[in-house]
């Protein structure tokens, strides 16, 4: 789904990177020397994932992805039949699982997930990144790009120029907010 619509669900990086690799191999097989892969992430607005990522050691990509899950610490006394549990930071936790079998991310983790998605995609074959946002917000996208460029200095962004965004109104609001926050008399 579009990043500015409800109902987005992400997949673990391994699933997405398999698609990037498939495109890169298709370029090689077909002799496409100037093909460009644009990796899009809707993590900013996605509150759900279809599955828990596979992780083999603390700090690996799967562990980083799972660290964004909304979890509760549990003990053997409050484990239920059918519960899914993972080990995180030396504790046993239960990710919040919905009746749809989707798992919920913690609130407020969207920007950090976008940064991780983007860095991971660029390190694994993507040429450009596309971060889908709910509205055009230059400050928000700039903050994420600044974080990405700490790891990948030459990272390049493709940004959504969707007609469903009211660009003029949103930019005017951003200028107004900036002036108000800086104490200018408006």
Question: What name fits each language-model region?
Answer:
Residues 1-186:
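Alpha/beta enzyme core
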């Amino acid at each position: 789904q579009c990043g500015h619509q409800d109902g987005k669900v992400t997949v673990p990086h391994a699933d997405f990177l398999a698609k990037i690799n498939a495109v890169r191999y298709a370029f090689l097989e077909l002799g496409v020397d100037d093909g460009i892969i644009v990796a899009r992430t809707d993590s900013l607005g996605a509150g759900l994932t279809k599955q828990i990522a596979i992780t083999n050691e603390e700090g690996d990509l799967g562990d980083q992805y799972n660290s964004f899950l909304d979890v509760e610490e549990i003990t053997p006394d409050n484990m239920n039949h059918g519960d899914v549990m993972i080990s995180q930071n030396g504790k046993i936790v239960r990710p919040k699982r919905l009746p749809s079998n989707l798992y919920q991310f913690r609130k407020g983790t969207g920007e950090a997930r976008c940064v991780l998605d983007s860095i991971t995609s660029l390190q694994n074959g993507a040429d450009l990144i596309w971060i889908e946002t709910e509205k055009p917000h230059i400050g928000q996208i700039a903050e994420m790009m600044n974080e990405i460029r700490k790891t990948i200095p030459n990272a390049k962004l493709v940004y959504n120029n969707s007609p469903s965004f009211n660009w003029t109104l949103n930019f005017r609001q951003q200028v107004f907010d900036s002036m108000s926050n800086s104490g200018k008399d408006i």
